[in-house]
Amino acid sequence: MQAEGNFGPVPESVACETGGPDFTYVRITRLAAVMPGSGNRPMDLGGLNNHQVHDFARFHAAAAALANGCRHVEVSGPQTRLTIDGRTVQVSSRRQPGSPWQVSAAHPVVDDAAAVIFVDLTGDVPDFCIAPAQRVRSDVKSHFATWLESRGGVRPRNPESDHSTVELDRIRQWHQRWDILEGRADED
């Protein structure tokens, strides 16, 4: 039985090459999230706090990046970042079905990020959208400005907040776009 992500079936196996002069072949059979002690039941992240969920998402994003052609991934620094093939990548996660990813409208993406990996933890296994950072910055700022204008220019309940969201429909086009991280894709 094939695992289901929020976007549809998740590949049963993925192969990739890693390493430099020493050739290494890695085959990941079913990149799935199984919590310790859960047998092989789907993810249940209910017992994790927000920091643990972000770490869980970040480590799965790192593994998926390697499985999809990236050669070097570092998990270090702030909880929302990875270094993939020398480029900073921001990781954002969600765990509630139907909920958007939460961001700041003023700074939706860290300044030095080349891309954002949106990790969807609402299905049986983690699923990923990989979007160019500048596209995310522009989209969030534009969407927030339009929303704010529709409210008369002032946020109704908390005027000082710049809290914004990224809805699934706004990033669906970046589903499984690992080529964005390698810089070989046209960023449409």
Model-flagged regions — what are they?
Residues 2-188:
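Nucleic-acid endonuclease domains
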